[in-house]
Amino acid sequence: MADGGLIGLYPGTFDPITNGHLDIIGRAAQLCSKLVIGVARNAGKGPLFPTAERVEMVRAEIAPIAERTGTEIDVQAFDSLLIAFAQQVSAQVIVRGLRAVSDFDYEFQMAGMNARLDQRIETIFLMASERHQFISSRFVKEIAQLGGDISSFVPKLTLERTLRRVGRP
């Protein structure tokens, strides 16, 4: 452990950030003295929001968590290899959320590859809370684009921005 406590990195595209992401961030913040939220540029996924706007939304939505937990939470965009970004921000752990068994298979492989690239950085998995196990940014975008109600899946600011982005009032 580094001087001052554990530094964690929670990476994702956050396109958009969901209540499930916020749940994982809140729980990770209780484990770490500093938590970096890495917003992946990931143009290959065809993001709904540009990177800068995703960073801005994440910053706005996590502010109450940082205040409540007293944890330093930093939000940064990145477009490098995840392990290289983890090294850059001095993370000792990469935090990943798991919703279902299907998530585990992919995440297990990624954790193994990351360990091969830098065995000093651990991956820790946090299980999604029961009420958030089915939420994904992909489903949120699809439901919003098709006129469905996403208000129980995303926080208020993100709800407003997502509805505007898909052309809904």
Swiss-Prot record:
Gene3D superfamilies, per the entry: HUPs
Pathway terms, separated by semicolons: Cofactor biosynthesis; coenzyme A biosynthesis; CoA from (R)-pantothenate: step 4/5
Nucleotide-binding found in the keyword field: yes
GO molecular function: ATP binding; pantetheine-phosphate adenylyltransferase activity
Protein's cellular compartments: Cytoplasm
Residue numbers binding ATP: 13-14, 21, 97-99, 107, 132-138
Binding site for substrate: 13, 45, 82, 96
Site positions per UniProt: Transition state stabilizer: 21
EC number: 2.7.7.3
Entry GO terms, CC: cytoplasm
Pfam family, one: CTP_transf_like
Protein keywords: ATP-binding, Coenzyme A biosynthesis, Cytoplasm, Magnesium, Nucleotide-binding, Nucleotidyltransferase, Transferase
Record field: catalytic activity: (R)-4'-phosphopantetheine + ATP + H(+) = 3'-dephospho-CoA + diphosphate
InterPro entries named in the record: Cyt_trans-like, PPAT, Rossmann-like_a/b/a_fold
Names of required cofactors: Mg(2+)
Listed GO biological process terms: coenzyme A biosynthetic process
Subunit comment: Homohexamer.
Family: Belongs to the bacterial CoaD family.
Function, as annotated: Reversibly transfers an adenylyl group from ATP to 4'-phosphopantetheine, yielding dephospho-CoA (dPCoA) and pyrophosphate.
Classification via HAMAP family: PPAT_bact (MF_00151)
Protein name according to UniProt: Phosphopantetheine adenylyltransferase
Organism, scientific name: Acidiphilium cryptum (strain JF-5)
